[in-house]
Structure formats: C-alpha cells, structure tokens
Amino acid sequence: AVMGRNLALNIESRGYTVSIFNRSREKTEEVIAENPGKKLVPYYTVKEFVESLETPRRILLMVKAGAGTDAAIDSLKPYLDKGDIIIDGGNTFFQDTIRRNRELSAEGFNFIGTGVSGGEEGALKGPSIMPGGQKEAYELVAPILTKIAAVAEDGEPCVTYIGADGAGHYVKMVHNGIEYGDMQLIAEAYSLLKGGLNLSNEELAQTFTEWNNGELSSYLIDITKDIFTKKDEDGNYLVDVILDEAANKGTGKWTSQSALDLGEPLSLITESVFARYISSLKDQRVAASKVLSGPQAQPAGDKAEFIEKVRRALYLGKIVSYAQGFSQLRAASEEYNWDLNYGEIAKIFRAGCIIRAQFLQKITDAYAENPQIANLLLAPYFKQIADDYQQALRDVVAYAVQNGIPVPTFAAAVAYYDSYRAAFLPANLIQAQRDYFGAHTYKRI
C-alpha cells in the first residue's frame, strides 16, 4: 500500500491527475485525507475507477505478488477495452509475468511487468524502473515512467525498455540477487574488521566513510556508515542490540533457482542466500557454539594494512558478484529471447535503486566497448582490478579460514575466480565416475 501510494504521489507531482482505488475504502480515504490539494481522485468501485481513465487506459497495479495480482487483473478485465495497458509494479516472479502477458495478449490487452527498485523513498522521489512487455505498449507509458524515474548524475532517467514479457521482472529479480550478495559481502567485511582488528563502531563508521569516498562509493556503503553510529533510546549502539537473524522475501532464492535452471554458476549470490538461512538457525547455532570447537581469532596484524586488504577484497568480491549476475542475465536473454542490453541495464541501476554504485558506470563502459563479452571479469578494467586485488582477497580468506571467521561469499569469490580462469578442472574424474556407475559415457580430449 505504501509503495502504491508513493508512486501515485510521484506521478501526481509530475503534473498528472491520478485516479486511485484500493479494495479497502478506508485506505483510499486515508490517502486522500493525508494529501489535501493533490490531484488524486478517489474511486470506490473498480467499474468507476476504470471508466475514469482516458483510453488507452494505463493502470498501475501495486499489490502483493501472487494470487492477489491475478485477482486484481480479473476484477479489471470486464471493464477494459482492447489496447488498454496494465502495469504490474510488484515483486512478481518472472514466469508469472510471462504467463499473464500471454493470457492478456490473447484477449487484446497489453501487460507490462515492471521491476521497481528503491523502496518506499525511491517510489516517492524517483525509483529505478525496469519495464518488460509489448514494446508498443511501453511507448505509451514511457513518458510517465521517464518523468517519475530516478535521474543519474549525467541527467539520464533510470528507466529503459528491458525486453518482452517477463524481462523486466527478471532483471529486477537478478538486481535483488546482486543486492543479497552486496549486503553479505559488506557483512563479512564488518565481521573481519571486528574479529581481526576489534574496531569500535566509531572506527567502523570512519572506515566506511573513507571507503564511500573511493571505488566502493555506493548506497549500501553509505547507509552502513550511518548504521554504525546510530544509537537506541538507551544510548546503546543499535547494531549491537539487533538479533543476528537476517530475514528474506524470497527474491534471492528465485535468482538462485533460475541459475540452477539455466546451468549458471551463481555461487556468490547463492551463498549469500544460504548465509541468511543459516543466520536464522539462531537456537541451533547457540547450542553448537557450546559443542563444536574452532580456533580463536588472532589479531590480524597492522591495522591500516588489514583494512586496505579487506577493502580490496570487498571490491573484487563485488565485481565477481556482478560478473555472475550479468552472466546469468546473458543466459536468460538467450533462453527467453529477450535481447537484453546489459550496458543499459547497468545504467538504470546508477540511481534510485538499492544497488546504486559508482562502479556501475564501469559495467556500462565494458559493454559499450564489447557488447558480446562473455564475462565482465574479462573486460580490461575488471581484469586489472583482479590482477591488483586478488592477493588481498586470498589473504583475507586465508586469515578468515585460519581464525574461524565465516566468509562464505568472500570464499565463493575466490573459488569462482580460480575455477573460471582454470583451463583444466578435475571434472574428467567426475565424468569417469558417472560412466563407471551409470554408463553415462564421456568425451575424449
């Protein structure tokens, strides 16, 4: 409801009159009461709501993904005309969007599955928008979406036509997977700095402030520096009194499931999903901590040197994560015939969304130079960073392993990097085993 309200207010602020409807009359009245003088027109029946719109109608749905979306569409259909456009701005599973697009197209309606990133504030002030569906229908809503989208530093709006049917929601799903990876990498950096150097929250805030002024400049690093200094009403640092269980809404899981379907090695992002799952086993972990032994963390040595190693490890880990995510976009584009423009996708992530970061411009540049590049690690800029920073990543992972500090995504970054650059892997033995017990055959070199 909040996302829908904020998007309506955003659209209204750009000079449009907006018809609004909610199943709950009270919710509709609440929005009107809280926003006097706005060009928001309330309707209390679906029929009146639909009939208030000029044709072709442009209807933005902001409902909980799943059966609720189908129910909302079914309630609208009796009052729609051929050519009307439904825009689903929820966190919808892309296969559902493909199905709805197919079904509605058969009835003469247009359907645009649209990823919206930026949270409640982004919805109000300007989100990153990822629309997918009929190109001709997108052209009819593009003027509105362009006006309400976030604007990057170069003045470009953070919206672009992604591709047919479920492409927009797919890109939003992978965006969320990358977000999981970013957040877990940052959490592991925090754990290393606390465990290895015993940094105070003030020192952590200072470190992240410095990081945010360099290569790691991003929304997530920016908010993390603020989190470290936030105190509760009792004067305690808030981060220290928050239970160490990270919840999830399932979009990271969808990204990993799709990777398995496509045969894509999305190891870092998948480890970040598993890290949330194991964090949720709090009672088991507390019990296991009293039974299972491991090394006590030893000081990590020179403070400035270790902080710089962790910074480099974090940046290279982030690059590996995005390389995996964009490789998956490439595989999905081929599988679903979407013809995705990876450079444009990186561009619309530069503002408004949760993963907005300075280095996204480097991704756009890499695809501008070579649109068909198989993996971002092969692009000159990222290859150079890997050359320069891999030793720091290896040192940090080795320190963590020796000192019993779990770093699943840092470790996944090293393993993926070494696997991807290996001309030969021991999979020949696995194939021999498969042939031995199951007559699966094998290929000779």
Swiss-Prot record:
Pfam families membership: 6PGD, NAD_binding_2
Active site annotation, chain numbering: K172, E179
Disulfide cysteine pairs (residue numbers): none
Annotated binding of substrate, by residue: N91, S117, G118, G119, H175, N176, Y180, K249, R276, R434, H440
PANTHER family reported in the protein's UniProt record: 6-PHOSPHOGLUCONATE DEHYDROGENASE
GO-annotated biological processes: D-gluconate metabolic process; organic acid catabolic process; pentose-phosphate shunt
EC number(s) reported in the record: 1.1.1.44
Keywords for this protein: Gluconate utilization, NADP, Oxidoreductase, Pentose shunt
Subunit structure: Homodimer.
Residues that bind NADP(+): A1, V2, M3, G4, N22, R23, S24, V63, K64, A65, N91
Catalytic activity entry: 6-phospho-D-gluconate + NADP(+) = D-ribulose 5-phosphate + CO2 + NADPH
One function term, GO molecular function aspect: NADP binding
Annotated InterPro entries: 6-PGluconate_DH-like_C_sf, 6PGD_dom2, 6PGDH_C, 6PGDH_Gnd/GntZ, 6PGDH_NADP-bd, 6PGdom_BS, NAD(P)-bd_dom_sf, Pgluconate_DH
Function: Catalyzes the oxidative decarboxylation of 6-phosphogluconate to ribulose 5-phosphate and CO(2), with concomitant reduction of NADP to NADPH.
SUPFAM superfamilies in the cross-refs: 6-phosphogluconate dehydrogenase C-terminal domain-like, NAD(P)-binding Rossmann-fold domains
Protein name: 6-phosphogluconate dehydrogenase, decarboxylating
Pathway: Carbohydrate degradation; pentose phosphate pathway; D-ribulose 5-phosphate from D-glucose 6-phosphate (oxidative stage): step 3/3
Similarity comment: Belongs to the 6-phosphogluconate dehydrogenase family.
